[in-house]
């Protein structure tokens, strides 16, 4: 039989034989002409699944897809008419349909373009530093002196009319160019404030041009005012004291009433607790008598539980198989337009091609750690297996209450299984849960046994370091001893 060529490479004899048998299965399935049937292959390696897909491509009326996870992934063959069309065609995500044209978005202006588009000096939403008005680089001294009267003409200063506050001789734009005028205004305002009388000394007699004559006896008037203020202050103090005494008496009465009520409640609670203690004592006596009966019944129940556990394990295995099949059925129907289908298994014996699949012999150095508190961390589990850490023991989490213990060799795993641990339990991974098995089989590095570090000495270490640094290791070569000359 001639070897087939795939992707420019000739297949091996075993793969060539496998492809020919798959072709025979597909020919037989196609001759049945039943659209409601699908052909299900057993779990095989990824390489063999790839060969099945490539073989199915040669049949125009058939389609193939894979279901399942990890080492349980399987290939399904169905008729092309009942296959759900994939979204990888021309109308897929790479090429959007014309019915959904892209929305046009106008050009985005930058901050400088937006400022130039609007009117100069107009605020946009929030305060922006506007562009300074054009100013001459040099202003003669004469023109700078002419700016003085503008600053002096401020309304409210030296009795000038507010209407004539702004000078008509220099019409300037109000902007950053009026810095000098603002400084002049500030100076004039401070001068006027310094000239004005201090408000703290307003009561002192001052003489001015338009001032009236001061009172003849200002000291007498001040004395009368202070006397009136003192009398009113004393009266207010007396009234406040009377009010405070009345409030204190009311508060004292309320506190006495509250204390009396609390004491009565405490006495009632003590009486209730005494009665409850008597009832508890009576109930404890009854429970002690009942516990004796329960102990005898518990021994009988333990014997029955052992039998029930064995039956439950068998039921769990059957439920797991049924659950796997139902999940596969859901995945298969999700890829088909026909929901009522019949699954047909192949007649091909794939036992000769499943040598590459992981089996129980590859999991002998792995154990499942279970039945421990969710609060335990990796450090706690490593501390429990501290005697195996030096040999290369590792832990891989599955969930909060399950983990995989990876030992360097099957002998170490058997040694750990023979021990009892107080805070957790362990068992071989082959007897573990489905999630733990999938976790281990999905990561091939778990299936590899860790190699022990080879024994080295100082000479080997120096040679390795020198080679890594690119240095030439000086080795003393022993020179051959010259032959001794015999005396004649």
Swiss-Prot record:
The keyword Transmembrane helix does not apply. Pfam families: R3H. The modification Phosphoserine is found at residue 232. Residues 244-321 form a coiled coil. Keywords: Coiled coil, Phosphoprotein. Residues 114-125 have a biased composition (Low complexity). One of its GO terms (molecular function) is nucleic acid binding. Residues 87-180, 195-322 are annotated as: Disordered. The keyword Mitochondrion does not apply. It comes from the Eukaryota. PANTHER family: GROWTH INHIBITION AND DIFFERENTIATION RELATED PROTEIN 88 (PTHR21678), R3H AND COILED-COIL DOMAIN-CONTAINING PROTEIN 1 (PTHR21678:SF6). This is R3H and coiled-coil domain-containing protein 1. It comes from Mus musculus. The lineage of its organism: Eukaryota, Metazoa, Chordata, Craniata, Vertebrata.
């Amino acid at each position: 039989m001639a070897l087939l060529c795939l992707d420019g490479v000739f297949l091996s004899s075993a793969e060539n034989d496998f492809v020919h048998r798959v072709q025979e299965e597909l020919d037989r399935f196609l001759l049945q002409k039943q659209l409601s049937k699908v052909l299900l292959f057993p779990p095989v390696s990824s390489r063999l699944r790839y060969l099945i897909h490539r073989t199915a491509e040669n049949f125009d009326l058939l389609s193939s897809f894979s279901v399942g996870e990890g080492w349980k992934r399987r290939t399904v063959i169905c008729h092309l008419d009942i296959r759900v069309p994939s979204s990888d065609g021309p109308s897929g995500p790479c090429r959007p349909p014309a019915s959904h044209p892209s929305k046009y978005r106008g050009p985005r202006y930058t901050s400088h373009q937006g400022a130039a588009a609007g009117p100069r000096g107009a605020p946009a939403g929030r305060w922006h530093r506007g562009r300074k008005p054009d100013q001459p680089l040099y202003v003669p001294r004469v023109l700078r002196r002419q700016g003085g009267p503008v600053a002096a003409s401020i309304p409210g200063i030296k009795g000038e009319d507010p209407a004539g506050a702004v000078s008509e001789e220099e019409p300037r734009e109000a902007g950053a160019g009026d810095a000098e005028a603002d400084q002049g205004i500030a100076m004039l305002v401070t001068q006027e404030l310094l000239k004005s009388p201090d408000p703290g000394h307003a009561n002192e007699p001052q003489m001015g041009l338009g001032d009236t004559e001061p009172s003849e006896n200002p000291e007498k008037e001040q004395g009368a005012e202070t006397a009136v203020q003192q009398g009113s202050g004393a009266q207010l103090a007396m009234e406040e004291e009377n009010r405070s005494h009345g409030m204190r008496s009311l508060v004292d009465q309320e506190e006495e009433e509250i204390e009396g009520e609390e004491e009565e409640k405490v006495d009632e609670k003590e009486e209730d607790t005494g009665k409850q203690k008597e009832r508890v004592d009576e109930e404890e006596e009854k429970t002690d008598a009942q516990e004796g009966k329960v102990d005898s019944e518990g021994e009988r129940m333990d014997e029955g539980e052992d039998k029930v556990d064995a039956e439950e394990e068998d039921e769990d295995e059957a439920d797991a198989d049924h659950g796997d099949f139902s999940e596969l059925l859901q995945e298969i129907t999700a890829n088909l337009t026909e929901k009522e289908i019949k699954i047909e298994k192949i007649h091909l014996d794939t036992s000769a091609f499943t040598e590459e699949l992981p089996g129980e012999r590859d999991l002998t150095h792995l154990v499942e750690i279970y039945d421990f508190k969710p609060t335990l961390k990796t450090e706690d589990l490593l501390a429990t297996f501290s005697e195996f850490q030096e040999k290369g023991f590792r832990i891989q989490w599955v969930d909060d209450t399950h983990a995989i213990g990876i030992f360097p060799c099957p002998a170490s795993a058997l040694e750990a299984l023979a021990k009892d641990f107080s805070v957790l339990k362990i068992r071989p991974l082959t007897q573990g849960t489905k999630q733990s098995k999938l976790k281990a089989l999905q990561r091939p590095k778990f299936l590899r046994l860790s190699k022990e570090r080879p024994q080295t000495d100082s000479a080997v270490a120096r040679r390795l370091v020198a080679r890594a640094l690119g240095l030439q290791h000086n080795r003393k070569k022993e020179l051959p001893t010259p032959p001794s000359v015999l005396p004649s």
